UniProtKB/Swiss-Prot annotation:
Coiled coil location: none
One Gene Ontology biological process: adenine salvage
GN (gene name): apt
Transmembrane segments: none
Protein name: Adenine phosphoribosyltransferase
InterPro entries: Ade_phspho_trans, PRibTrfase_dom, PRTase-like, UPRTase/APRTase
Family: Belongs to the purine/pyrimidine phosphoribosyltransferase family.
Origin: domain of life: Bacteria
Organism: Mycoplasmopsis pulmonis (strain UAB CTIP) (Mycoplasma pulmonis)
Entry's EC annotation: 2.4.2.7
NCBIfam families recorded: apt (TIGR01090), PRK02304.1-5 (NF002636)
A molecular function GO annotation: adenine binding
Amino acid sequence: MNLEKFIKDVKDFPKQGINFKDISPLLANGQALNYTIKKMAELAKDADIIVGPDARGFLFGTPTAAFLSKPFIMVRKKGKLPGEVIKHEYDLEYGKDILEIQKGVIKPGDKAIIIDDVLATGGTTKAIIDLLESQGAKVIKIILLLELTNLNGRSKFGSLQVESLVKVSV
């Protein structure tokens, strides 16, 4: 199935000069969504845990984890998770941000696969890798619906395997 036909270009969103890749048509098509989850599950079968960032990583990571009967670990921005959390501060283009996971959800040695919707510059994904590794997990792969290849985000991950179902240049 050609998933690219379910990703719509929206010019000048969210601001002038940006060509936004809208995945809503894919989510609104049951066959395309089912195909996407099955493809991601094939790629993620070696994981002990599936990890996804808020919010759109949840859209693909949770059903993939459920399909494989694997745990799904949420990575959220500061202050969005209850209980004790592990924090990781990382640099943005114009400042800093903080990602969190709940304490105790990662076991040392867990083989983790990160699933997300889009890879652009790779900054957030790199921060997730650092957070997981700080808890003893081994990130073995990154799986994405869409990779914006000209932004070269995968260069931040060294030799780590990156699987993208759709690759485009913006």
